[in-house]
């Protein structure tokens, strides 16, 4: 089965082809970073328009690069949510229309389920069950995953997501969008022990809170005034985020008794986070798994793969185009429940 995956939840237009026998046949990705950089963040209307502009050229490029004909596509998977309504609708309408024209099934995929399953595309994929740390611009969650659609929410951010905190602090510091990679780069030049920023809720269950940390950075920047300590600020802020994510992940593993941690989402590409996780998990004889670098950010491959997992169990959507900007993963059903 060859599945076309379409990702348009925010500011990246990603398309990919996944073959159930050969694996990933190819993928293309167009990032709107330059488009939104001058605004310091994503402008939903501009994002939607750019998805419309890029969808067909990217599909043509993907088919050409992969040497696959449209007629060979067996199914279409698109991001149904969560995400920006207009951006989601663009991908959903395109995917549904293409599937209808080809007389093939289509399925809407949960964006974060796609992220969580992306490490399964690696050369050494994790086996279920595992704990998943999902960290992106819109989500920070710890999930226990026992199988496709068998997810238990262990903890989540009660305010800002980790990626959102990175972007907001970067904006305070005058760094360009997107903030996460730029803070990480600047942090390499700084001392993470210079400023003792708070780790909110560190010892309170498995939920996260990053708004207080963001406020603390703002206060410190005002105190410094014209004094340039940006590298130390970046390093200390990043360390506070990483410290919280690592300690909560270790706590989740101990609480569930599981020995495998999957980390996914855009923030999972952060090298300091990876270093700290590998060090901490080695102490408790647990393993950590990541997606390949190209699959950490939003992409079509994770949507194609997640879609295939459900399509092979008999799940598909009807002709009604549905998008769900707010969609908890715990509301997803097991594929077996759908065909029983």
From Swiss-Prot:
Question: What residues bind substrate, as annotated?
Answer: 134-138, 167, 180, 270
Q: Which cofactor does it need?
A: Fe(2+)
Chemical reaction(s) catalysed = L-threonylcarbamoyladenylate + adenosine(37) in tRNA = N(6)-L-threonylcarbamoyladenosine(37) in tRNA + AMP + H(+)
Q: Please provide the Gene Ontology terms (biological process) for this protein.
A: tRNA threonylcarbamoyladenosine modification
* EC number(s) given by UniProt: 2.3.1.234
Annotated Fe cation binding sites: 111, 115, 298
Bound how, and how many: what does the cofactor note say?
Binds 1 Fe(2+) ion per subunit.
This protein's source sits in the domain of life called Bacteria
Q: Is-annotated flag, keyword Metal-binding?
A: yes
> One GO molecular-function annotation for this sequence?
N(6)-L-threonylcarbamoyladenine synthase activity
What is the uppermost EC class here?
transferase
InterPro entries attached to this UniProt entry: ATPase_NBD (IPR043129), Gcp-like_dom (IPR000905), KAE1/TsaD (IPR017861), Peptidase_M22_CS (IPR017860), TsaD (IPR022450)
Subcellular localization(s) per the UniProt record:
Cytoplasm
Arranged from A to Z, the UniProt key words for this protein are: Acyltransferase, Cytoplasm, Iron, Metal-binding, Transferase, tRNA processing
**SUPFAM superfamilies for the chain:** Actin-like ATPase domain
GO cellular component terms, alphabetically, are: cytoplasm
Q: What is its main location?
A: cytoplasm
Instruction: Tell me, in a sentence or two, what this protein's role is.
Output: Required for the formation of a threonylcarbamoyl group on adenosine at position 37 (t(6)A37) in tRNAs that read codons beginning with adenine. Is involved in the transfer of the threonylcarbamoyl moiety of threonylcarbamoyl-AMP (TC-AMP) to the N6 group of A37, together with TsaE and TsaB. TsaD likely plays a direct catalytic role in this reaction.
Which family is this protein grouped under? Belongs to the KAE1 / TsaD family.
Protein name, as recorded: tRNA N6-adenosine threonylcarbamoyltransferase
Q: Which organism is it from?
A: Acinetobacter baylyi (strain ATCC 33305 / BD413 / ADP1)
Lineage, highest ranks first: Bacteria, Pseudomonadati, Pseudomonadota, Gammaproteobacteria, Moraxellales
